[in-house]
Swiss-Prot record:
Glycans are attached at N219. It holds the Pfam family TNF. Residues 1-22 are cytoplasmic. One of its GO terms (molecular function) is cytokine activity. The keyword Cell membrane applies. It comes from Macaca nemestrina (Pig-tailed macaque). It is a single-pass type II membrane protein. Cytokine that acts as a ligand to CD40/TNFRSF5. Costimulates T-cell proliferation and cytokine production. Its cross-linking on T-cells generates a costimulatory signal which enhances the production of IL4 and IL10 in conjunction with the TCR/CD3 ligation and CD28 costimulation. Induces the activation of NF-kappa-B. Induces the activation of kinases MAPK8 and PAK2 in T-cells. Mediates B-cell proliferation in the absence of co-stimulus as well as IgE production in the presence of IL4. Involved in immunoglobulin class switching. This is CD40 ligand. It is found in: Cell membrane; Cell surface.
Amino acid sequence: MIETYNQPSPRSAATGLPVRMKIFMYLLTIFLITQMIGSALFAVYLHRRLDKIEDERNLHEDFVFMKTIQRCNTGERSLSLLDCEEIKSQFEGFVKDIMLNKEEKKKENSFEMQKVLQWAEKGYYTMSNNLVTLENGKQLTVKRQGLYYIYAQVTFCSNREASSQAPFIASLCLKSPGRFERILLRAANTHSSTKPCGQQSIHLGGVFELQPGASVFVNVTDPSQVSHGTGFTSFGLLKL
């Protein structure tokens, strides 16, 4: 008699270990990413905090410096005469630098009090529209970057009354895109009353690097004294 024998099926391989490894790697990745983000945020916070501490320290030093000057002026004995003299010398140097910067800025902006000359495309006008344009009859605007020779001649009537003997000033000015206007060249000439209208000329010229969109123009102290005859007053530029 033959009996059947059922052999038990083999057990399936355990799959729990790979699943646990995947979960572990997933959690580890999240932890590392979180740590990196946290470290970056902490670095930004620390940088800003150090900047704030530096500003506070500078303000504290300025406050101590001003208090020391006050103590020197009141004649407190806690400070020696040598220390007070050195501190006062530093303070006077700071004030002098501030005043010099203010005077320089005033000189740079003084041309705003003058008047821009008007120009017309006549006479020996040879400007190329592909290179430069005359805008509003006042300024020449370049379209290409490069070195330019800029020139100007202003002829004016030098006869003046005795009550107004201020020199006639002509300024060649530059206005760059996104920047303030500044003076490139300036010249002055005194008036003369020996003739009914003695003609005098001022010549300005130089080589400058201009960016696309930069404009140049001429300012004078009194446009009513300018002689506009052909060849007397001119303004232009040449690309080198």
